Amino acid sequence: MTNTETAVFGMGCFWSAEELFRKIKGVISTEVGFMGGTVKNPTYGQVCRGKSGHIEVVNITYNPKIVKYTDLLNLFWNNHDPTTPNRQGWDVGEQYSSHIFYFTEEQRLLAEKSFEKIQKSSDLRIVTAIKKASDFFPAEEYHQKYFMKKNNSILNF
């Protein structure tokens, strides 16, 4: 069995985030869902109505010998706007806020270092939260691999 690690990012709509990361060499699997809230096993409806406190996230299992956590962080920073609180594009709400959830002390340190680098290069305040990972709750099946199922990826990654 290959040694794997997990990364979790909230960067707006989880459909787009999953589409971005699932195509990366070294990423073994992706799953969209929710993290950071107070309700166990929240539904998409509860999250969208702001009733659970969760963030839409992509849960990434990867092989660190092929893709580094810092590479995933770079994709995270370069593919959403970390300066807009509770919003990404047309998607508005707390569930769309920018988050990095870490599992290890090394991930925390790398996330903080990358945050500082991005902040130094920006005239705007970076609002990305860096938090210890909590329970991950998978979203309903119809959300998983959404763009792949629809064969309608309008994204250009």
Swiss-Prot record:
Instruction: Tell me which Pfam families the record gives.
Output: PMSR (PF01625)
Q: Name the catalytic site residues.
A: 13
Catalytic activity annotation: L-methionyl-[protein] + [thioredoxin]-disulfide + H2O = L-methionyl-(S)-S-oxide-[protein] + [thioredoxin]-dithiol; [thioredoxin]-disulfide + L-methionine + H2O = L-methionine (S)-S-oxide + [thioredoxin]-dithiol
| InterPro entries in the record | Met_Sox_Rdtase_MsrA_dom, Met_Sox_Rdtase_MsrA_sf
What keywords appear on the UniProt entry?
Answer: Oxidoreductase
Q: Which SUPFAM superfamilies match?
A: Peptide methionine sulfoxide reductase
| Gene Ontology BP terms | protein modification process
Q: Name one GO molecular function term.
A: L-methionine:thioredoxin-disulfide S-oxidoreductase activity
Provide the E.C. number(s) assigned to this enzyme. 1.8.4.11
Q: Sum up the protein's function in the record's words.
A: Has an important function as a repair enzyme for proteins that have been inactivated by oxidation. Catalyzes the reversible oxidation-reduction of methionine sulfoxide in proteins to methionine.
Provide the family line: Belongs to the MsrA Met sulfoxide reductase family.
Q: Can you name this protein?
A: Peptide methionine sulfoxide reductase MsrA
Q: Which species does this protein come from? A: Methanococcus maripaludis (strain C5 / ATCC BAA-1333)
Task: Name the gene for this chain.
Answer: msrA
